[in-house]
């Protein structure tokens, strides 16, 4: 699980959050300390975003998010959802569907239901909250140190709120 979370954090965080936040800091002439805080915030937001993306792929409404509803299962993508499921007694019923290129909607729904029953969905929803809380703590620290203007803090909080509640 630790490896999956680390990979998820760096995969999405770097190009979607860390680099854009650092670029914004450079463009407005922020200090290196501000850049460093923004990088930490970006890593946390990126992890939350990726975990939320994984949840949407398996449990989300495809009409809402526009993705293939079972692509992660079909591709055998090792996510936090799967890592948790592997540790449960439900794994045998899930594994037979995992990584099957020919996964049909009925079997995909059965795997999704088992993932929900074994607690994977709840577990990963809890994981989403942790990096959002860490991002908020890092943001408060940066604000307290006078490294970020209030408008930047407000924008980052709005972004974090969208990350945590996204449905697509």
Name what the model sees in each region.
Residues 1-168:
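All-alpha prenyltransferase/terpene-synthase fold signal
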């Amino acid at each position: 699980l630790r490896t999956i979370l680390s990979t998820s954090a760096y995969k999405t965080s770097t190009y979607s959050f860390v680099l854009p936040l650092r670029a914004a800091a450079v463009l407005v002439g922020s200090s290196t300390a501000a850049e460093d805080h923004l990088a930490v915030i970006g890593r946390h937001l990126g992890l939350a975003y990726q975990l939320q993306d994984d949840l949407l792929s398996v449990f989300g409404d495809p009409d809402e998010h526009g993705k293939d509803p079972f692509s992660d299962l079909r591709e055998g993508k090792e996510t936090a959802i799967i890592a948790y499921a592997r540790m449960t007694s439900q794994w045998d019923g899930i594994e037979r569907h995992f990584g099957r290129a020919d996964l049909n909607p009925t079997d995909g729904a059965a795997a999704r239901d088992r993932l929900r029953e074994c607690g994977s969905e709840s577990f990963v929803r809890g994981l989403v909250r942790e990096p959002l809380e860490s991002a908020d703590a890092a943001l408060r620290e940066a604000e307290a140190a006078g490294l970020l203007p209030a408008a930047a803090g407000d924008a980052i909080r709005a972004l974090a709120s969208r990350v945590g509640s996204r449905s697509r």
